[in-house]
């Protein structure tokens, strides 16, 4: 299959790319590097990316940002960072990308444990993650041409422990192999509308 991976250079993305590249053709899209550049917060950039890439079999989004800050310090503009990037960025990848997926193709979006188990300073990120979960379940009901859509939601991954463990006291780090398998389940399985949770109650 021909897979397009946005965020393929990140902590999770590079491991996902390494796995799928063994058996599939991979196109990496990133804001500053990759085979093609894209800013998922800009729908025009998304359209240009798809025009450049052409028809594909699967789209994986492992990109998007949201503001982490104390609730009482978050401004309206702070919330819009996550809404424009991680939420609408992924929504627009689906909205626009459906015309570039071959029949039976799939979308795999990415969220995280904050949708179910938020921690301090993550109000905006948790809100965005929850919105994506609802979007995936609803969009799965209406996608045409046998297209599928799922979202992988991971906990604190092993490769990011040093950077984020202070925010997640008592959380058990998730092995990267387990996280990768979430993407494999979405891309190579037959399910749709699924929230593939890669954590066990923290």
Q: What annotation goes with each model-predicted range?
A:
Residues 147, 151, 157-162, 166-202:
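C-terminal helical subdomain
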Residues 45, 88-96:
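Conserved mid-core alpha-helix of short-chain dehydrogenase/reductase
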Residues 4-19:
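N-terminal Rossmann NAD(P)H-binding glycine-rich loop of SDR-like oxidoreductase domains
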Residues 82-85, 91-92, 106-132, 136-144, ...:
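Catalytic loop of short-chain dehydrogenase/reductase
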Residues 70-71, 78-80:
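Substrate-binding pocket helix/loop in short-chain dehydrogenase/reductase
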Residues 60-69:
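Conserved NAD(P)H cofactor-binding loop of Rossmann-fold oxidoreductase domains
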Residues 40-56:
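Conserved Rossmann-fold cofactor-binding substructure of NAD(P)-dependent oxidoreductases
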Residues 30-44:
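Rossmann-fold cofactor-recognition segment
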């Amino acid at each position: 299959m021909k897979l397009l991976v946005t965020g393929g250079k990140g902590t999770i993305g590079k491991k996902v790319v390494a796995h799928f590249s063994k058996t599939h053709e991979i196109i990496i899209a990133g804001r500053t590097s990759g085979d093609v550049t894209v800013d998922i917060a800009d729908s025009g950039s998304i359209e240009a990316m798809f025009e450049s890439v052409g028809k594909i079999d699967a789209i994986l989004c492992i990109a998007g940002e949201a503001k982490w800050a104390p609730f009482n310090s978050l401004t309206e503009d702070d919330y819009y960072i996550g809404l424009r990037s991680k939420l609408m960025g992924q929504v627009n990848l689906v909205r626009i990308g459906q015309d570039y997926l071959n029949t039976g193709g799939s979308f795999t979006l990415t969220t995280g444990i904050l949708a179910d188990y938020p921690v301090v300073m993550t109000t905006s990120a948790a809100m965005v993650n929850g919105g994506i979960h609802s979007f995936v379940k609803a969009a799965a009901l209406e996608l045409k041409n046998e297209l599928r859509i799922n979202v992988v939601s991971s906990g604190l991954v092993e490769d990011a422990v040093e950077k984020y463990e202070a925010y997640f006291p008592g959380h058990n780090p998730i092995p990267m192999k387990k996280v990768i398998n979430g993407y494999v389940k979405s891309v190579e399985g037959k399910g749709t509308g699924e929230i593939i949770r890669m954590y066990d109650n923290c």
